[in-house]
């Protein structure tokens, strides 16, 4: 089992537990250049809110999109969008990534902006 397969296996376990809870899920995906966040409905079929460093509103304000500052901006943006749709409580799905660095920065920024998890 290589590194990616191990991460995907961890992610599948987490998603199974979150689906059993029946909560909206804040999922995060990171690449070396960008970071993405989505709030997904409990059935797993509908994206209720999404934010990433590919959005022009975020991309124009940052010189680099693959660092903690970018993750903080995406965390604030996803919280704003989720609250605008009426979602205040979510379950955090780190997609098998370690809760460290950019993933942690995004989560903390979303909490500070009003999301509860």
Curated annotation (Swiss-Prot):
One GO cellular component term, please give it: cytosolic large ribosomal subunit
- Is the Thylakoid keyword given for this protein? no
GO biological process annotations for this chain's record?
A: translation
Keyword Hydrolase recorded: no
The GO terms describing molecular function are: 5S rRNA binding; structural constituent of ribosome
Fetch the CDD domains from UniProt. Answer: Ribosomal_L18_L5e (cd00432)
Q: Which InterPro entries match?
A: Ribosomal_uL18_bac-type, Ribosomal_uL18_bac/euk
Q: Which terms are listed as keywords in the entry?
A: Ribonucleoprotein, Ribosomal protein, RNA-binding, rRNA-binding
SUPFAM superfamilies linked to this entry: Translational machinery components
Q: How does it assemble?
A: Part of the 50S ribosomal subunit; part of the 5S rRNA/L5/L18/L25 subcomplex. Contacts the 5S and 23S rRNAs.
Q: Which PANTHER family match?
A: 39S RIBOSOMAL PROTEIN L18, MITOCHONDRIAL, LARGE RIBOSOMAL SUBUNIT PROTEIN UL18M
Summarize the protein's role.
Answer: This is one of the proteins that bind and probably mediate the attachment of the 5S RNA into the large ribosomal subunit, where it forms part of the central protuberance.
**Family according to the record:** Belongs to the universal ribosomal protein uL18 family.
Protein known as: Large ribosomal subunit protein uL18
Q: Which organism is it from?
A: Methylococcus capsulatus (strain ATCC 33009 / NCIMB 11132 / Bath)
């Amino acid at each position: 089992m290589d590194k990616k397969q191990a991460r995907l296996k961890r992610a599948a376990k987490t998603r199974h537990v979150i689906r059993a809870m029946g909560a909206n899920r804040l999922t995060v995906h990171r690449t070396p250049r960008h970071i993405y966040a989505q709030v997904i409905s409990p059935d797993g079929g509908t994206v209720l809110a999404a934010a990433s460093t590919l959005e022009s509103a975020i991309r124009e304000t940052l010189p680099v999109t693959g660092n903690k500052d970018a993750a903080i901006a995406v965390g604030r943006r996803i919280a704003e969008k989720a609250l605008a749709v009426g979602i205040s409580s979510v379950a955090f799905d780190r997609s098998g990534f370690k809760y460290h660095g950019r993933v942690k920065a995004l989560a903390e920024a979303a909490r500070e902006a009003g999301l509860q998890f």
